[in-house]
Structure formats: C-alpha cells, structure tokens
C-alpha cells in the first residue's frame, strides 16, 4: 500500500533547472497570454458595441471569448509567476480551486464549441428557419444552461477527486496543476475515483463529439451540393480550421486523461498539456473571429469612431 500523508500544499516541477530557460518559458507564456488577452478583449468589445453583430453567432463568439480568457487565466499567470520567482508551491485549497475552475472552463469550452457547431448547422442547412430556431431567448437559455451545467460538472468532478485530505505524495510532475497528475496523487478509493472521473469525462466528451460530428457532417453535405466552386472552397476553408482545433483539443485532452502518468516531467506530457490548455484560447480568436470579414469591418468602424472622438 502507498504511504499516505496529509498535505497542506503541493509542489510543482520546474520547467527547467536552468534559470535562462525558466525566463524564456515565462517570456513565451507572457507573450501568448497577452496575445490571448488583447485578441479576446477586442472581440468582446467589438461585438458588444457594434449593433450589426448582435446576432446568435456573435453572441456565442462573445461567450467563447470570455471563456477563453478565463480558461487560460487559470493556469498561465501562475505558471509565469512560478518561473520568475522559482516558487513552485501551491496550497491544498489553491490546488482544489484551480482544478475546479480548470474543469469548469475546459468542459464549457467543449460545450460552447458544440453549441456553435449547431448554430452553423442551422444557418447553413436551414437558413430560412434560422431566425425561428435561434431566437434571442433560446440563445440566452443555451448559454446559461451551458455555464451552469459545466460548473455543476466541475463541482462533482473536483469533489470526487478531493474527497479526503490525504495523498500519496505532494509533488506534481507537471509545471501546472494538470488534472491527471493531481488525480494520480489523491488516495481515496483510487479505482473508484479514476472510474467515476473517466465515466464523467467520457460522457461529456463523447456526447459533445457526436453532436459536433453530426452538425459538421450535415454542413459538409450541404456545402458539397453548392454549385459554385468558390462558395464551396470558402465554406471548407472556414470549417476546416475549426475542426482541426476541436480535434486537437479533444484528442490531446483524452490522451492526457487516459494515458499513463509519467513519474517525471516529459516532453510528451508538456506538449500535450500545452496543446489543450494554451492552444485553443490562442487560436480561437483567429479562427472564429479575426478571419471574419464582419468582425474586421466592425473593428475598423470602432477604430474610426475612437479616432474621431479623440480629435
């Protein structure tokens, strides 16, 4: 049987034992975080201030931007601070809070991508019924239900992981509180914990994956029937990057959850963790919004207004 200890804090592995690499890691993460911050705040401001963008699609894009800011803020700022100060500890309650919010925002990310794929399905496959199906009230209900469901899921998920205040070890073999690595430390009825965590995660991921694939299958089927080759190419160029990000997010997240937990920080674990924690918030503004002509036009109008107001 593993030795059990009552812990009050956890220790994280450093990104590198070399100070210069620690600074490089902090600088790179800071640039990524600032890019995500600026991009998403700009999208939120533009969609909020421009009346032309008060439609269901942009309502969900604004929710996704808010979510991306929250999602990346759970892990990256703390990681930057740890690298610069070389302080790798986090309190037990701090770890619980971070796991809770990470679970909530990760599940909400998946849920909102699913809702947005359904929105595109209705817009492309049933354009005449779009306004009747995607009403303002219906969109608000979907958004509120998504947020509440994901925070409830995170509460069950986190509560199940931290049922007892004892662990096998206080050292997390990752440079942030990655859920699989934390799960490997908790000691309470390990098999039951892992089984329930896997069951909850599998139901969420599989359900969202099936719904997204159905939506995109219908979208591509409709697009292939479009007579104009230029319109087909435009539709494919819009949907393909979205699918790539979704598949990266799902596959790396599942691999991290189902794969073996390494005894030390490895390059493979690092790449996988970065792919599903940093990459989606970084790419989503580019793929879903900044490549969008209406968003770029609205940004231009906003910049023009600001320019003339200052004169």
UniProtKB/Swiss-Prot annotation:
Q: How does it sit in the membrane?
A: Multi-pass membrane protein
Q: Which residues are glycosylated?
A: 3
Using the chain's own numbering, where are the disulfide bonds?
A: 95-188
Instruction: State the InterPro entries in the record.
Output: GPCR_Rhodpsn, GPCR_Rhodpsn_7TM, Olfact_rcpt, Olfactory_GPCR
List all topological domains (Extracellular): 1-26, 77-92, 163-189, 263-269
Where in or outside the cell?
Answer: Cell membrane
Cytoplasmic compartment residues? 48-55, 114-141, 211-241, 291-311
Q: Name one GO molecular function term.
A: olfactory receptor activity
- Which keywords has UniProt assigned to this entry? Cell membrane, Disulfide bond, G-protein coupled receptor, Glycoprotein, Membrane, Olfaction, Receptor, Sensory transduction, Transducer, Transmembrane, Transmembrane helix
CC annotations in GO:
plasma membrane
Protein's UniProt keywords contain Lyase: no
Q: Where are the transmembrane segments?
A: 27-47, 56-76, 93-113, 142-162, 190-210, 242-262, 270-290
* Function of the molecule: Odorant receptor.
The UniProt family comment states: Belongs to the G-protein coupled receptor 1 family.
Query: Can you say what this protein is called?
Result: Olfactory receptor 14I1
**Organism expressing this protein natively:** Homo sapiens
